Amino acid sequence: MKLLGFFLSWVSVCAIVSASEEGHIYCGRYLAYKMADLCWRAGFEKRSVAHYAGYGWPLLPSLSEERGKRGIADECCLQPCTNDVLLSYC
């Protein structure tokens, strides 16, 4: 019986964690508020990729890869995106 209770608790925790990783759609001011909050919490300042070129930053994929023609609005307003995607724009 204890094993069943432990198993159900474990499944519940896994379900909550996986639900928190699902993407959400952010548009307009909600997207701006979310970006400001995430970037502020992460301690990012908006700088260009060229600023980091001499500091060994090519190891960071979010700074070394080009996002192409798609922007944050295309990526997070038209389809759900996660916090990791949003953080890549900080």
Curated annotation (Swiss-Prot):
Pfam family, one: Insulin
GO cellular component: extracellular space
The keyword Secreted belongs to this UniProt entry's keyword annotation: yes
Domain of life: Eukaryota
Family designation: Belongs to the insulin family.
Subunit relationships: Heterodimer of a B chain and an A chain linked by two disulfide bonds.
SUPFAM superfamilies: Insulin-like (SSF56994)
UniProt keyword list: Cleavage on pair of basic residues, Disulfide bond, Hormone, Secreted, Signal
GO molecular function: growth factor activity; hormone activity
Organism annotation: Bombyx mori (Silk moth)
Signal peptide stretch: 1-18
Note from the entry: Silk worm has two kinds of PTTH: 4K-PTTH and 22K-PTTH; there are many forms of 4K-PTTH.
Compartments where found: Secreted
Secreted as UniProt keyword: yes
The protein, known as: Bombyxin D-1
Propeptide: 48-68
S-S bridge residues: 27-77, 39-90, 76-81
Predominant localisation class: secreted
Task of the protein: Brain peptide responsible for activation of prothoracic glands to produce ecdysone in insects.
